[in-house]
């Protein structure tokens, strides 16, 4: 994934902490916005958790520990303070954030809203936040054999923007226990990594990234240092109102690692070195439009992006347990009370509507893409990172590297749109230029709400209200999900509501399964493996 940009000219005074490592400033108290989310069980009961979110360290004011002097201004480090990575970390501090006024981040109950352009004392573009379990640690999700559900409103995201919700294999504490130079930790949003091995991060592994720093040629606020931060990435949702994709990006290591120079690979390295790193920067992606299903997602289409909807992602294992091997990543939607199956590929050589090893191999072959996915472990490697636990990222960004054309237009732009895999959406190849998007769509925003996590089939039939963004429960409150009538646009049968039958796309069998073994009208209990059958 490409990096995110922020326009911030800090004009603050501070009283600063002093010590011998990357520090925390004290001018602005860090207060994390609250965000509720739910954990569900197989019987349909969901418990509300009182969580909070934190903005990434790259967005924060970085200043001297002995004065209000910026350590980083525009897209350059102050070399009188930052003579090298270690010294810079000792001399500089990260300060607290004013989330709404500076970054356009607001929460209400279970809803998080991210504004695109925020003009306060300085100009901010986009944001990247993490869900926390407490004030000093990120929440870790172990996705294997589970289901992750959320509501999203992308109606105000035009071409060139990406409202991305995804998981990365960051350290739960942001790196404080492993790297003594990191005194800020998860409380201040440190420790980011992804499959692009981003080199635009200001701090990595408790050190600054000022050595070899080259200011960006097309962005006055960013640059690239000698080091990158690598880890596995599961893009559950990358989308605007035109296109969407979900993508698995495995890495050789299940934990975060630091890389050097162009050997990092990914977006931030020379074009010839894109695949030289330890991660898969391309991943195995599922974009319905790219797979020929051009009438499935968008304004007024099957999944109508003019209105909020629910996104359900299932991480299915070979034995149906949380300790099994990842074999499939499946997508469902719920909108206006209807369960909608994912838009299937229209290419005869690429079958299905989910990510499997067979799908990834056939898609790479059809599109002529290099199969770096298998080189770095494929689905099994992705599953190993999930088993360790991954951090939830919620973000909104524009793309200075490729104008987001890889998501919503024809890409590469010098290839024919009729070539399989080139067309990814209806946006013009001239769209997505950050300066234009920022000028023409400053009021764009995305909302995420009603996050739920639990066993497969436990979250999306529990009466979530798309876009409601409200929760009256505390962390000790348990609610019992009620059965609702679910329909699908992929069949002429509307189904029926029944307490004795599994709902559309729900689990209906498998070893150890004690729930219903028949499906509502119009659906058949379909064998997936010995531990899991589903109403399809």
UniProtKB/Swiss-Prot annotation:
Disulfide bonds, paired cysteine numbers: 508-525, 519-535
Region annotated Ser/Thr-rich linker, chain positions: 459-500
UniProt-listed SUPFAM superfamilies: Cellulose-binding domain, Concanavalin A-like lectins/glucanases
Enzyme class at the top of the EC tree: hydrolase
Residues with glycosylation annotation: 351, 414
Major location (coarse): secreted
E.C. number: 3.2.1.91
Biological process terms in GO annotation: cellulose catabolic process
Pfam families per record: CBM_1 (PF00734), Glyco_hydro_7 (PF00840)
Keywords assigned: Carbohydrate metabolism, Cellulose degradation, Disulfide bond, Glycoprotein, Glycosidase, Hydrolase, Polysaccharide degradation, Secreted, Signal
Active site per the UniProt annotation: 233, 238
Residues covered by region (Disordered): 464-499
Spans annotated as Catalytic: 22-458
Function: The biological conversion of cellulose to glucose generally requires three types of hydrolytic enzymes: (1) Endoglucanases which cut internal beta-1,4-glucosidic bonds; (2) Exocellobiohydrolases that cut the disaccharide cellobiose from the non-reducing end of the cellulose polymer chain; (3) Beta-1,4-glucosidases which hydrolyze the cellobiose and other short cello-oligosaccharides to glucose.
PANTHER family tied to this protein: 1,4-BETA-D-GLUCAN CELLOBIOHYDROLASE B, GLYCOSIDE HYDROLASE FAMILY 7 PROTEIN
Record-given protein name: Probable 1,4-beta-D-glucan cellobiohydrolase B
Species per Swiss-Prot/TrEMBL record: Aspergillus niger (strain ATCC MYA-4892 / CBS 513.88 / FGSC A1513)
